[in-house]
């Protein structure tokens, strides 16, 4: 195999084959790749055809107590196929209780009415992003790419004001002069998105949680009178408010999220905390 051409899908991955951005086909050409079903007979591997292999497998597991153990490393389709094969009662996700609780919480959030969960294409249209406790460059690289695109929206907006088309990359870059839509990253380690972030902070899971609640409180305060919203950075220049660094950061994040046309908060389960 020398080349793969993917059909364009504007609603899902566009030209990407994998939503995690990790598709590869190099293994297809490996000399040691299994291409033939084998059966071990008298300590020797004997080649068998696929129909015989399937029939023999069914015959051997029929009327026996079989369990299926899935894996978060396997694809959704593979886990689903295994679950169908062994039955709901005989299937394990391969997760421990804490990990399963996290997955259940994610499912609950995704299925809750009133909570907007944008697709990867939608993420690109947001103009302010807060990432809390999730290194998406490692857990969902396609989402990370969408965040990179979202960071360019301020430049596109500035270019549009001068009637410059967004696809003119160099003119848009010159007009923006480095301006980007605000992206805040709060994580337990530095991430590969730091280069596009307005602020990137390394903190403990406990402090990340505290900051998240403080941002929510500040947004609630701003919502009391949107007409009086003032950039916290401007206030800090005029007077020493005496507030701690976390509170000041929470105010700045809340301000940028409220001022944005389409703010977005991204989180995940990699810190194993609900």
Residue ranges and their predicted role:
Residues 2-36, 149-150:
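Extended active-site and interfacial segments that coordinate phosphate-rich ligands
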Residues 35-274:
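Cofactor-pocket helix-loop regions in the catalytic cores of large enzyme subunits
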